[in-house]
């Protein structure tokens, strides 16, 4: 680190005035002793020289862009002196505890409940950033859900000891310091809290594969509760994507170790899934009900996105991320970079490597255009949305994967226009990584000017209009430059699967009914659904609060043009009598408004050359 000797000297000189001695946190957790679905966390504290100390579990963590309040899952918080005598503790808020007579503090302990199945705790933690405690089966330890820090002491070293059940393995990017491989204790050491919070762990009976990609060792670890999927199969899907990304990044990777930690859920009521990125790992929460084909596609696309985060925010990040505040975070303006450009690169790398062809790539971009303009505020400033994503614009966050990726695409095409195809966003990312890097943050308000300095004056206008401002992206002009015609008012044919009816719970019950048919599609009308119909089954599968997600997923995945769809409903035929009725209709093709992207039949030589450069073929 630059000027390291001066920083060390400064730390020694100021240690006394800060009120804390420079030592380490020593945490321990015993996975063999859960109680009531909770684990006990014990911390032997670093010496404290202040009268009071405030201990935090995070309110927000990097990459989630949502308030999670991990302290809500901690209970029975206690503090002790060296003789084991209790010290007074006051809970300040959901995530903070104030300890009195802190100069005497020696140990704290508390119990942690998991986020995945604790409905009585009214928080909403997305599963990839959550925790799971299942005795003798599996433990998911997102570190920030178990381990905290004293206010002002985030940069002290951490030592975490985990006692594991016999035969369990801890999948993580961290290196186990305990060389006794036959023992049941793992010991992990990190430089500070940020490094610990950035490293999830999953403990279970192992199904793992190690891959070698360029200079990096890659761990793939899968938990499939019903053994439907094996790690070797997912690793085979992931490796070509990683090879493509290595080539996309210039032939080497900015890491030497990485872990894909994958949990396949067998929950029948699963309505959401996804992943959370970390600097040297990513954690996945995916449905075990996926077909092999769907899982293969999903893992390629999601892994491609998450793995690209090794570049940003690992090597390119603002001060807001480099020195993240877990309690009162200041959001960066640049979600277009962290998530949008990452999403763009994930698909662009697959195109350049030949993993997907141009028609497939363009289909994905059409979906992003349609989703951005129909599901989100397409005129909202992206920088404003980013800064206020925790509250005012939290519902707009998914647009980072839609319009954010389109911003990345547009920037790439604009750079290639200006450079004659010789310079694009992957070159820009390499230049930004060289300018900043893992230990040097950029100032949030200066990034656009720095990018302009590295590229072309016209790029400042691009950011001003389309990222800071709300002007529509110039997709027509940019696609035209590579010989592709964009029609925002196009149409496409598709199998109509939507019913266009509203679902709701029948009053006083947990039974699902048809609430309204005002916006019924042609399919919904042909089925003959009526308001107040109680849905018994769809396609002969029981339709309940527990099964509705898997039933609809099965329908969406497996039913094709010409197949017959059925609803079994209970319909009132009189005030006190209901009759079970089976309704059927066949799936038909419909023409719907949709943006289209079509390669020109006769592009100019200049357009063709620029397209080849963009797709990864050298300019002739």
Predicted regions and their residues:
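Post-HExxH zinc-binding segment in Zn-dependent metallohydrolases
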Residues: 275, 282, 315-316, 327-378
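C-terminal recognition in membrane/secretory proteostasis and scaffolding
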Residues: 346-347, 355-620
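Juxtacatalytic substrate-recognition/specificity segment
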Residues: 43, 207-334
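Bacterial Sec-dependent N-terminal signal peptides
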Residues: 1-26
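Intrinsic-disorder/low-complexity, polar/charged segments enriched in Ser/Thr/Lys/Arg/Asp/Glu/Gln
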Residues: 24-26, 38-42, 52-54, 105-107, ...
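A generic secondary-structure signal for well-formed alpha-helical elements
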Residues: 116, 168, 249, 253, ...
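Early extracytoplasmic/domain-onset interaction patches
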Residues: 22-60, 140-145
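Non-catalytic architectural context of zinc metalloproteases
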Residues: 67-76, 80-255, 271-274
């Amino acid at each position: 680190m630059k000027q390291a000797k001066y920083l060390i000297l400064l730390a020694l000189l100021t240690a006394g005035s800060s009120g804390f001695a420079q030592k380490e946190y020593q945490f321990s957790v015993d996975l063999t002793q859960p109680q009531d679905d909770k684990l006990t966390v014990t911390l032997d504290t670093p010496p404290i020289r202040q009268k009071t100390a405030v201990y935090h579990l995070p309110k927000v963590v990097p990459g989630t862009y949502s308030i999670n309040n991990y302290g809500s899952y901690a209970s029975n918080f206690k503090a002790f002196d060296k003789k084991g005598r209790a010290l007074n503790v006051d809970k300040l808020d959901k995530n903070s505890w104030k300890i009195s007579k802190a100069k005497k503090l020696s140990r704290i302990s508390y119990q942690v409940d998991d986020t995945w199945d604790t409905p009585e705790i009214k928080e909403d933690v997305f599963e990839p950033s959550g925790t799971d405690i299942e005795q003798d089966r599996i433990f998911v330890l997102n570190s920030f859900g178990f381990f905290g820090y004293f206010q002002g002491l985030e940069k002290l070293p951490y030592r975490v000891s985990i006692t594991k059940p016999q035969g369990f393995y801890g999948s993580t990017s961290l290196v186990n310091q305990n060389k006794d491989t036959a023992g049941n204790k793992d010991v992990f050491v990190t430089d500070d809290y940020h490094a610990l919070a950035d490293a999830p762990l999953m403990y279970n009976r192992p199904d793992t594969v190690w891959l070698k990609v360029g200079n990096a060792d890659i761990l793939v670890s899968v938990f499939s509760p019903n053994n439907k999927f094996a790690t070797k199969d997912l690793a085979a899907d992931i490796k070509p994507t990683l090879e493509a990304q290595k080539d996309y990044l210039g032939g080497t990777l900015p890491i030497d170790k990485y872990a894909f930690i994958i949990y396949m859920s067998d929950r029948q009521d699963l309505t959401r899934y996804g992943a959370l990125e970390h600097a040297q790992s990513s954690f996945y929460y995916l449905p075990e009900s996926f077909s092999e084909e769907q899982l293969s596609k999903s893992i390629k696309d999601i892994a491609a996105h998450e793995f690209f985060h090794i570049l940003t925010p690992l090597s390119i990040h603002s001060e807001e991320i480099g020195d993240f505040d877990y309690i009162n975070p200041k959001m960066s303006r640049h979600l277009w970079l962290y998530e949008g450009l990452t999403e763009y690169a994930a698909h662009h790398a697959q195109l350049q490597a030949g993993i997907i062809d141009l028609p497939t790539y363009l289909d994905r971009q059409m979906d992003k255009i349609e989703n951005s303009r129909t599901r989100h505020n397409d005129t909202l400033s992206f920088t404003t949305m980013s800064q206020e994503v925790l509250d005012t614009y939290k519902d707009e966050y998914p647009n980072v994967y839609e319009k954010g990726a389109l911003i990345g695409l547009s920037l790439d095409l604009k750079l290639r226009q200006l450079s004659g195809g010789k310079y694009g966003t992957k070159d820009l990312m390499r230049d930004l990584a060289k300018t900043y890097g893992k230990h040097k943050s950029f100032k949030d308000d200066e990034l656009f000017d720095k990018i302009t300095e590295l590229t072309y004056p016209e790029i400042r206008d691009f950011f001003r209009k389309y990222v800071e401002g709300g002007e529509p992206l110039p997709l027509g002009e940019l696609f035209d430059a590579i010989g592709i015609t964009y029609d925002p008012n196009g149409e496409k044919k598709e199998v109509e699967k939507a019913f266009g009816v509203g679902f709701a719970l029948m009053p006083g019950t947990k039974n699902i009914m048809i609430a309204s048919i005002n916006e019924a599609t042609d399919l919904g009308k042909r089925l003959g659904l009526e308001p107040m119909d109680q849905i018994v089954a769809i396609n002969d599968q029981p339709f309940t609060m527990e099964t509705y997600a898997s039933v609809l997923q099965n329908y969406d995945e497996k039913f094709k043009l010409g197949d017959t769809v059925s609803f079994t409903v209970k319909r009132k035929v009189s005030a006190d009598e209901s009759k079970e009725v089976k309704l059927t209709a066949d799936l038909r093709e419909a023409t719907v408004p949709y943006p289209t992207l079509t390669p020109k039949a006769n592009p100019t030589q200049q357009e063709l050359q620029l397209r080849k450069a963009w797709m990864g073929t050298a300019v002739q």
